[in-house]
Amino acid sequence: MQDRFLKSIANLPEALAKAIVPMLDKDFAGHLDAQQIEELKTASQLTEQDLLLALLPIAAALARVPISEFYVGAIAKGKSGDIYMGANLELAGEALFHSVHAEQSAISHAWLSGERQIEDVIVNFSPCGHCRQFMNELVEGQKVNIHLPEQKTQPLSHYLPYAFGPGDLNITEPLLTKQQHELSLDSSDPMIIEAVDHAGLSYAPYTKNYAAVVLETKDGVTYSGRYAENAAFNPSMLPMQMALSNMARHNRDFSEINRAVLIESSKGSVSLVGATMDALHAVAAVELEHIVVESE
């Protein structure tokens, strides 16, 4: 079991702790499939809602919060029945807008894993306005059930009434709908190919800047992030922050970054290169490879 979960395990019901410890191996990064959830329900004798609430300390252990020291864990449950954990991320000494919220982390985890719809979000503190707006961008976002400790389960519409969302801007394929943008680049570099593939899957209906970041560690492992825009603009999640959140979930240190690539579309009305470089240089002494590709 990874050391970062030791304190969390001590706070779990004994039967649940015993059942989940074998799942928290060196490769665990916050994903449990539907079958594992059923196994944990059987072993713990908890209802699914109580189980997911009980697992929040595990999710919160994924956080990196050098500024606030305030650990927030979130779990996104997909239509598939799988769950995806996430936690907040802060960059030491850097502006707060670089931060990733736990709900963003969990939802991006689900998105990168191929999930097409989020049905439930479980979180250990009430979602802030930023996160409510971020979740409202999802497929049927207003119907997403929000679960909080000692609170009645309510749909997002309860927490964000009279919401402004993608429908108000005539967007009919919201976040997590499969995106397939054709981007053209001739390269034999596996890392660049991976970045182009993720950029083609990014969600940027407002600026058309289909973009992605891939980070490579010194042992050759890659971690990706895609651009996820929001109708309210500011809650958009940048690909570098998504990639860093991805690394944090996998328990990798940012000092291990050996290479970083940003791909973005030539037809976008904005560029992410400045913000991406700021975040990268805050965590690693690596130069950003910035490639603009043609969109078909």
Curated annotation (Swiss-Prot):
Keywords on record: Hydrolase, Metal-binding, Zinc
For binding Zn(2+), which residues are annotated in this chain's numbering? 101, 128, 131
Q: Which BP terms in the Gene Ontology apply to this protein?
A: cytidine deamination
One annotated GO molecular function: zinc ion binding
The UniProt entry, under InterPro entries, shows: APOBEC/CMP_deaminase_Zn-bd, CMP_dCMP_dom, Cyd/dCyd_deaminase_Zn-bd, Cyt/Deoxycyt_deaminase, Cytidine_deaminase-like, Cytidine_deaminase_bacteria
- Where on the tree of life does the source sit, at the highest rank? Bacteria
Role this protein plays:
This enzyme scavenges exogenous and endogenous cytidine and 2'-deoxycytidine for UMP synthesis.
Tell me which family the UniProt entry assigns to this protein: Belongs to the cytidine and deoxycytidylate deaminase family.
Subunit: Homodimer.
Protein name as it appears in the record: Cytidine deaminase
- Quick one: which gene encodes this? cdd
